[in-house]
Amino acid sequence: MLQQNPSSPLHAEQFIKSSNSTPTATPAPASATATAPIHTVLATPQRPSSPRQFFERLYGHLETRTHNSESGDIDVGTHAETPYQSDGGSASSPDISISDERVSLVSFPSYELHAPTPDYSAYGAIANATLPPALSFPAFSADPHINAGFSAFLARRRRKEGRQRRQRTTFSTEQTLRLEVEFHRNEYISRSRRFELAETLRLSETQIKIWFQNRRAKDKRIEKAQIDQHYRNFVVANGFMSTIMGQTSYATSAPATSSAAATAAAMLGSSYYAATPALLPSTLVNNARRADVNYVDIEAQHQQQQQHHHQVHPDQQQQQQQQQQRRSRFVPPPTLINSC
């Protein structure tokens, strides 16, 4: 039977040829036939190996196992033996290395707020568990200064919770009324008067002193709120008046043609409308202005006549009537424009 070296390709070729060869008889040398009997050596038949076994024998020495021993990394190698049964009955069990790379786990600091009790053993196990870096909380850092400050805060909170809280003083209606009367007499109570009130109302001097302090603060808050309200009302009134004054100035600066156009539009029928001042002829605009001025003068004179009617002489009344008639002759009537 031939022996092979798996590390050299030449022996591999010889191994392939020998595995595919048929069993033959090996003749003895001629010198041996004369003196010794003939011994026939038959080669043991071999089945062809599987490709897996073949390449493992050829390149198995090149495979190296790498173990990464970094801090925090866990390399779990599971070795499974997979025996391969060939047709010839020879069992081979190559060692196959399977590396399972896991996510590196970083220990997370746990904080014990209170002393652990036996009932919370499960919670303690959860607190000591490790978390991946993606789930880390930046607020809880491992800085000793932050931990010391947090511990001091918890200690102050425990002391504050353990301290008995002072109860709020509740005054009766009679006590409140008596104190209000005294406050309206004088906002700052003297020591002798405070002692008398404490004896009368069955309160301590400290309670009466604090009540007067709170009452003065309340008066200041009310006074400030009233001042703010007056200021807001003043600002609103000024803004309203400025708005009104702005509208009045705009109305007085508007041309007199707008009033004439409005009068003409009010007098129009269904088939007539008032033209804009830009489209009206200059003569019509001038006539409208003169009519406006004359109308204002007539109204003013009429009011003056009513006021001084008992002082005016009959001759003067006739003269005024004649002047009004002459003015009415020169004032043309408003002209209407037909759009059809």
UniProtKB/Swiss-Prot annotation:
Pro residues biased stretches: 331-340
Record's GO cellular component terms: nucleus
GO molecular function per UniProt: DNA-binding transcription factor activity, RNA polymerase II-specific; RNA polymerase II transcription regulatory region sequence-specific DNA binding
One GO-annotated biological process of the protein: positive regulation of transcription by RNA polymerase II
Classification via InterPro entries: HD (IPR001356), HD_metazoa (IPR020479), Homeobox_CS (IPR017970), Homeobox_TF (IPR050848), Homeodomain-like_sf (IPR009057)
Subcellular location: Nucleus
UniProtKB keywords: Developmental protein, DNA-binding, Homeobox, Nucleus, Sensory transduction, Vision
Top-level lineage group: Eukaryota
SUPFAM superfamilies on file: Homeodomain-like
Pfam families in UniProt: Homeodomain
PANTHER family listed in its UniProt record: HOMEO BOX HB9 LIKE A-RELATED, HOMEOBOX PROTEIN CEH-62
Role description: Required to establish the unique cell identity of photoreceptors R2 and R5 and consequently for ommatidial assembly in the developing eye imaginal disk. Repression of expression in R8 photoreceptor by senseless (sens) is an essential mechanism of R8 cell fate determination.
Name used for this protein in its record: Homeobox protein rough
